[in-house]
Amino acid sequence: EKHYPVFAGSTLPVKKLGWSNMYTSMGITGFTFALTGEAAVNPQAPDVSLPFTMCHEMAHRMCIAYERDANFAAFLAASSNPDTQFQYSAYFMAYRYCMAALSTVASQSAVDARARVEAGVNDYLRYDMVQYDAFYQTRKRETATKVGDKVNSTYLQTSGDSSGLASYGEVCDLLVSWHIQEILLPSLAVEENPFDPLDKTQVDLTGIVNAR
């Protein structure tokens, strides 16, 4: 709320989904009940993704409907949270979404980029990457996941989100724009009035002149 007032609102706790095994078999990590406004997450999802998913479902609760928008809202909220676990989750998930998007248009570039990233990470981050991949690779082979994806995609499309499941990954466009505007451009900006020790309007040179 401090950085993004749009998030000011309900602070009701995010609940734990019951029947976790069923939701896990369908590849569902979180859910927002439209009729009650309750947000819940699947406790069996990878730990590293839970803070981000909590923020994602809370975004839905605040009527941020489209998945790409809810994902971006989750990134902003989690990355601004003073809790470092939320910050870590935000950037971890942003990385995963962007790498997945890159792999669809330039698979070898994605492989090369991931190799460079993973070569420099510590063992804890590498463990989270392995666990995250293992969770989703296992679920992809389950029939229930395919059915769940189809139902979810159809639901999103009938709700006005024409991209269906692809909407989740479209957050990459927003993430890249945010990085350019908030990180890249400010770092390239030239200081308007750089300090010049010989500029008489910035420094009193009287003492230097008299000392000659």
Set out the residue ranges of the language-model regions.
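Pan-zinc metallopeptidase signature
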Residues: 124-212
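Generic structural signal for hydrophobic core residues of well-folded globular domains
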Residues: 45, 58, 62, 77-78, ...
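Auxiliary, metal-adjacent structural segments of Zn-dependent hydrolase domains
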Residues: 1-37, 43, 47
